[in-house]
Amino acid sequence: RMNRVLRVLREKSQWDEPLGAGRGRGIAARIYSVSPIAQAVEVSVADNGDFTIDRVVCVLDCGFAVNPLGIEGQVEGGIAFGLGGAAFGNIDIVNGEVQQSNFHDYPVIRMPQMPKVEVHILPSDEPPTGVGEQATAPIAPAVANALFNATGRRVRRFPLSSQGFKLV
């Protein structure tokens, strides 16, 4: 099933099409609850480390899709949550107490930062599986791989803001 997901991702993301200077593409994949998912991310990076996420292509095989629109919403939400964590999610603990208390000191991704997201649900006769958390985990490594592809700089830890990259 993962092989099929990756083949469709290659096609839908136009993986073989070159990107211009300062642009990069990266992928990440995982199996969650027996269901494979893969994501391709395209970024544009300035010399100072400012970057935009231009496009996310997500392909998943979650078995029989009972509610495709609900699945798309879950996947888009998971991607948004994962992007915020990857870009600037940081929790400070002092004397056993979390210092962040709300969105004023724990930033989340904002609408202008959210990329175009394409969700491709593969037709399947397999039993349906969960998709609630499926899209969150692979997005950070896919972005890191895209940044590496664009800049040659490996990301070794998150958030990206701690590595000199700023999502704008």
Roles of regions detected by a PLM:
Residues 1-168:
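Cofactor-binding beta-sheet edge motifs in enzyme active sites
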